[in-house]
């Protein structure tokens, strides 16, 4: 009986060792699985964080870009409003020029138009105020033109037109004209005018 008990004890001891070994290996494997899962979870978390940071940066840049665009748009709107105010004020100023400033300007504008037409006889048109001014000083006007051009020019006053001022000059047959009314000149030189106003206002 004693021998049998020893055998049983040995079997139990070996079984216990095997059980402990299996449990130890199982624990190691479980820990390994847990570690791998933790690493995967950490990597996943880091990936999610990086993605969120990237998306946040993209959104930040988008917001900044939109804000800059909106600021630029508002600035341009303000600049345009100010430029329009200046142009409107200029139109009003030109429409109310005193005679001593306006008359030599008419001589200059008519002279430029006559040079462009290359004609010895022209018809000049403008608003009623301007035609009345020229009618009252027609001889002086013709003399000033002759001095400016270095040759005689036959000038006929035409019918009134709608304009704030300046002059429209035509050949007698009305086939060719040069529009030197203030509106037309402002329109022709609007780009240069806007640039000059913008530089004066905004530097």
From Swiss-Prot:
Belongs to the V-ATPase E subunit family. GO terms for cellular component: plasma membrane; proton-transporting two-sector ATPase complex, catalytic domain. This is A-type ATP synthase subunit E. Component of the A-type ATP synthase that produces ATP from ADP in the presence of a proton gradient across the membrane. One of its GO terms (molecular function) is proton-transporting ATP synthase activity, rotational mechanism. It is a peripheral membrane protein. Its main location: membrane. NCBIfam families: PRK03963.1 (NF003049).
